[in-house]
Amino acid sequence: MLDVKYIRNNPDEARKACVQKGEDDHVDEILKYDEQRRKILTDLEVLKNKRNTVSKEIGQLKKEGHDAQDKIAEMKEVSDKVKEMDDELKKVDEQLNYHLLCIPNIPNPDVPVGDDDEDNQVVKQVGEPVKKDYFKPHWEVAENLNLLDFKRAGKVTGTRFVNYVGDAARLERALIDFMIDVHVTEHGYVEMMPPFIANRDSMTGTGQLPKFEDDMYKLEDMEYFLIPTAEVTLTNLYRDEILPGDFLPRYLVAFTPCFRKEAGAHGRDTRGLIRQHQFNKVEMVKFVEPEKSYQELDSLVANAERVLQLLELPYQISLMCTGDLGFAAAKKYDLEVWLPSYDTYREISSCSNFEDFQARRANIRYRPEEGEKARFVHTLNGSGLAVGRTLAAILENYQNPDGTVTIPEVLKPYFNGRDVIS
């Protein structure tokens, strides 16, 4: 959420962000309700001062033994008007807050202007992408080795679900443990195991609601949602709190299943693991001081990179343009792993700096020093990594001519030293 004062003083910047991110423009509504709110508050202050004055006059009249009925009637009239205006203020606040929640974050000046992923800028490539004649897509590799059962998962649940079988389940579990181990032991994150269900306030705090409600799985007749990412539950752990200054920076990491309807993905990536309604992900979340958040973004990207480097998977990093930046982010990098079957790089991690956008929505502040005014923290998050897509990348990049899959060196301890999946 943007500060209403910022929008009041910079309406054109807020409108520009709406255009750049392809969002509806709510700026005029915000300015209208902001003006109404400030007028009501001014009028309320006048009325409450009058009520206080009349109250003192009533007390003085009674003390002197005079009739105070006229003043009491005046007092009731003023009190009724105050209540009426308080009710009006509540309605205006609700409207103002709704429209504020619909305004996207302002892109950082370093973000390239563009419409979609065609305008993203590749800033780094690591490893040599390989495509050999015998390479098969990961779903065919998995079928030949009896690793992934899409058919029976479809029977149990529906399309875009999968059942991991045998060594695939073990590989998925190994990847989760490996990723968590790297982030905890090498990067100083604190491991969490948060709920997989979040309430409406939490989903609003991180920016999923109200915009993305149609893409969320909502529990029937309840204000609970299956989380689309651990970002929601990790970030909201500190909602409505003032953190001590020495608490920052705070790094959290968690593995959770994630649930998304993928409403806009009809007909895309219909085979394999790339786009599932339920998938596993290791998520990193940071709470940091505002002055250090872009340094922390670079560090976050490096943390996600480290996993790909240890797995020896070819990847590239792209800086997202304004049109592909997302609703809540001020700046975002995508890490994209090489998938031979697609003959391209596919997203495996997004690392974003939200500045104080989420913190303002979720009311997460910190006090730099005792007695100082509380400030909003800056929040960041990044996938570290999407586990199913990592498994797909291993099946494709580590496949052998005989159909077996070599286990990456760093994962062999999780397989009791085995070399291949066969």
From Swiss-Prot:
Catalytic activity entry: tRNA(Ser) + L-serine + ATP = L-seryl-tRNA(Ser) + AMP + diphosphate + H(+); tRNA(Sec) + L-serine + ATP = L-seryl-tRNA(Sec) + AMP + diphosphate + H(+)
EC identifiers of the protein: 6.1.1.11
Gene Ontology annotations of biological process type: selenocysteine biosynthetic process; seryl-tRNA aminoacylation
Primary localisation category: cytoplasm
Root EC class: ligase
Chain sites annotated for binding ATP: 260-262, 347-350
Gene Ontology MF terms in the entry: ATP binding; catalytic activity, acting on a protein; serine-tRNA ligase activity; transferase activity
The entry's keywords: Aminoacyl-tRNA synthetase, ATP-binding, Cytoplasm, Ligase, Nucleotide-binding, Protein biosynthesis
Protein residues bound to L-serine: 229-231, 283, 383
Pathway connected to this protein: Aminoacyl-tRNA biosynthesis; selenocysteinyl-tRNA(Sec) biosynthesis; L-seryl-tRNA(Sec) from L-serine and tRNA(Sec): step 1/1
InterPro entries membership: aa-tRNA-synt_IIb, aa-tRNA-synth_II, aa-tRNA-synth_II/BPL/LPL, Ser-tRNA-ligase_type_1, Ser-tRNA-synth_1_N, SerRS_1_N_sf, SerRS_core, tRNA-bd_arm
Cellular location(s): Cytoplasm
GO CC term, one of those recorded: cytoplasm
Quaternary assembly: Homodimer. The tRNA molecule binds across the dimer.
Similarity section: Belongs to the class-II aminoacyl-tRNA synthetase family. Type-1 seryl-tRNA synthetase subfamily.
PANTHER family in UniProt: SERINE--TRNA LIGASE, SERYL-TRNA SYNTHETASE
Role played: Catalyzes the attachment of serine to tRNA(Ser). Is also able to aminoacylate tRNA(Sec) with serine, to form the misacylated tRNA L-seryl-tRNA(Sec), which will be further converted into selenocysteinyl-tRNA(Sec).
Entry note about domains: Consists of two distinct domains, a catalytic core and a N-terminal extension that is involved in tRNA binding.
Protein name as annotated: Serine--tRNA ligase
Organism of origin: Natranaerobius thermophilus (strain ATCC BAA-1301 / DSM 18059 / JW/NM-WN-LF)
Lineage of producing organism: Bacteria, Bacillati, Bacillota, Clostridia, Natranaerobiales
